[in-house]
A protein has these predicted regions:
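Conserved acetyl-CoA-binding loop-helix of GNAT-fold acetyltransferases
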Residues: 91, 97-110, 135
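Active-site rim helix/loop that mediates acceptor-substrate recognition in acyltransferases
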Residues: 20-53, 63-65, 70-74
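Conserved acetyl-CoA binding element of GNAT-fold acetyltransferases
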Residues: 75-93, 123
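Conserved catalytic-core motifs of GNAT/GCN5-like acyltransferases
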Residues: 123, 139-192, 197
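A short beta-loop-alpha structural element at the N-terminal edge
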Residues: 2-17
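Conserved GNAT acetyl-CoA-binding A-motif
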Residues: 112-125
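Glycine-rich phosphate/pyrophosphate-binding loop shared by adenosine-nucleotide-utilizing enzymes
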Residues: 56-63, 84
Length: 205
């Protein structure tokens, strides 16, 4: 079996969506499902797929998408230069151990450099992905908690002034603030809305 990294094509859409859905179901990296393939209108982007070639047949088994800053700090956390924010990275579980993730990261970096960008940011709340990035010696650049709270009476009253109801409020805070936040607010703990620690990593090239 050979693995090839190539650019995404429009005819890949249905297969890409299927692979993305499988990866999403096994990861905590995403907060929502999607029914349309992201296009990144108005932005420079990288869209790559990993294709397995077996017995004369080919199938998409991994993917990565990068969206690039139009202006410094527009998308990326670090503000020293324009970079790429990696929105998608994953591979099918049955292809574990073949180095596909590293191949996609390397190919994305090469494509980014060809477009004039020299750094990529990888943010994830999935612990397996965090361990993977650490094994690759990526530099950690930040962390924060992502969580949902039940609206306080004050928040509910403010929104109801415009006849807006809120089932929950999606929030973020720094780790140092997390203990106080847990004491002060009614945080939703039940899956799939439970809190996660999101960690950011960076590569430069």
């Amino acid at each position: 079996m050979n693995i090839e990294i190539r650019e995404y094509r429009n005819e890949d859409r249905d297969e890409w969506m299927r692979v993305h859905a499988i990866i999403l179901s096994l990861s905590h990296a995403w907060n929502y499902t999607i029914q349309e393939r992201p296009e990144y209108e108005g932005y420079t982007s990288t869209r790559l797929v990993a294709v397995a070639l077996e017995n004369g047949q080919s199938r998409i088994v991994g993917l990565t998408d990068v969206q690039y800053d139009n202006t410094t700090g527009e998308l990326c956390f670090l503000k020293d230069s324009r970079g790429g924010y990696v929105l998608e990275l994953g591979r099918l579980p049955e292809y574990k151990g073949l180095g596909i993730g590293k191949m996609l990261i390397d190919a994305a970096a090469e494509d980014a450099a060809g477009k004039g960008f020299h750094r990529l940011e990888y943010w994830t709340q999935d612990r397996t992905a965090q361990r993977f990035y650490r094994r690759l010696k990526m530099k950690e650049i930040g962390r924060h908690y992502r969580f949902r709270i039940k609206p306080t009476p004050e928040i509910s009253a403010l929104l109801m002034q415009d006849r807006v109801g809120a089932e929950y409020v999606y929030c973020a805070c720094l780790p140092d603030e997390w203990p106080l936040v847990k004491q002060k607010y009614d945080i939703i703990q039940k899956h799939p809305l439970e809190p996660h620690l999101c960690v950011g990593f960076e590569i430069r090239f």
